[in-house]
């Protein structure tokens, strides 16, 4: 079972937090800090798996760093570490496809879409889908279509304003 999913930047700011077990909010905040501290202080050559007792007894923290972001899954002992690493890879590739090279700002300003993509991959702590194409297709069908404005672009408005004077 997957207990929680986090995305942190390299400064420790959580960009996505999703708990699949009921945990008091004050404890959640402490867990987020503890997990970031455990992951961020490891050398780059260290293994991407950590044994932990932070959530629901004995569990594992499995993470992967991409540029300035840490993608972290907290799972029970029944989950395959390599399977979760692959799942993180699939999740990141789905984000990349949906946002054309996802960056930290996408995580900040499009958090609802990020949660929708995660919901296509994991629900209730269980893995739902690992097929990248299916995840992207389902997520794109859920994302709101942005409407084009009929208003004049700002640059045209500014130039027409300047010609009047």
Curated annotation (Swiss-Prot):
GO cellular component: AP-3 adaptor complex; cytoplasmic vesicle membrane; cytosol; Golgi apparatus; intracellular membrane-bounded organelle; nucleus
A biological process from GO: vesicle-mediated transport
Entry keyword Membrane: yes
Cell compartment(s), UniProt: Golgi apparatus; Cytoplasmic vesicle membrane
Membrane topology: Peripheral membrane protein
Main location group: Golgi
Protein name: AP-3 complex subunit sigma
Family: Belongs to the adaptor complexes small subunit family.
Transmembrane parts of this sequence: none
Entry keyword set: Cytoplasmic vesicle, Golgi apparatus, Membrane, Protein transport, Transport
Cystine connections: none
Lineage of the organism: Eukaryota, Fungi, Dikarya, Ascomycota, Taphrinomycotina
Gene name per UniProt: aps3
Function statement: Part of the AP-3 complex, an adaptor-related complex which is not clathrin-associated. The complex is associated with the Golgi region as well as more peripheral structures. It facilitates the budding of vesicles from the Golgi membrane and may be directly involved in trafficking to the vacuole.
Record Pfam families: Clat_adaptor_s
Assembly with partners or alone: Adaptor protein complex 3 (AP-3) is a heterotetramer composed of 2 large adaptins (apl5 and apl6), a medium adaptin (apm3) and a small adaptin (aps3).
Listed InterPro entries: AP_complex_ssu (IPR016635), AP_mu_sigma_su (IPR022775), Clathrin_sm-chain_CS (IPR000804), Longin-like_dom_sf (IPR011012)
PANTHER family xrefs: ADAPTOR COMPLEXES SMALL SUBUNIT FAMILY
Domain of life: Eukaryota
